[in-house]
Amino acid sequence: GVILDSPDMQKRVKQLDYGVGFNGYFNAGVMLINNDEWRKNNVTQESLSMINCGKIFRYADQDVLNILLNGKVKYLQRKFNNKTTLSVNFDAEAKNIDNTIIMHYVTPNKPWYKIFKARYFDRYFNESPWKNNRRFFSPSPSEIRLKAKREMSGKNYSIGLYYYFCYLISKVFRLRF
């Protein structure tokens, strides 16, 4: 089972001419896989062969899976893959979360880094068996610097200085905290 990708992505992929029907391209970040069928059709090996054939696929493994599984998938409701993004420059999570089963953070910015505000993730993380596990502060020093700039431009000087200090420490001492 897969979830159709956004209309914008359908248009972009149509131009790539992969042979995937318009409005048939799915987001491969969340898939419900029938393991017996997957093995029977040798999907892992076929995917690796395509990825290593030398052709450049715009959306990498997602394109390959769409090509290989074209016409062989069942489409599920969007609530099983509600895509959202995170950034230090704005606070955003999925707007329509009613009935959401799986929230999928689609950028490299993931909610398990403390620098990103992700109220839904935080809520469920704090109720999970992993609530006492350490969460890293940021994926990179540059994200900390962006957060510092955002806070400073919002006139939150003490918070901005705190993040800038964290940025300097992580950059100079190559620390990850």
What are these regions (language model features)?
Residues 15-21, 89-91:
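Short, P/G- and charge-enriched loop/turn segments at secondary-structure junctions
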Residues 19-30, 57:
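A recurrent flexible, glycine/aromatic-enriched loop bordering the glycosyltransferase active site
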Residues 1-17:
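Conserved donor-nucleotide/metal-binding helix-loop-beta segment in metal-dependent transferases, i.e.
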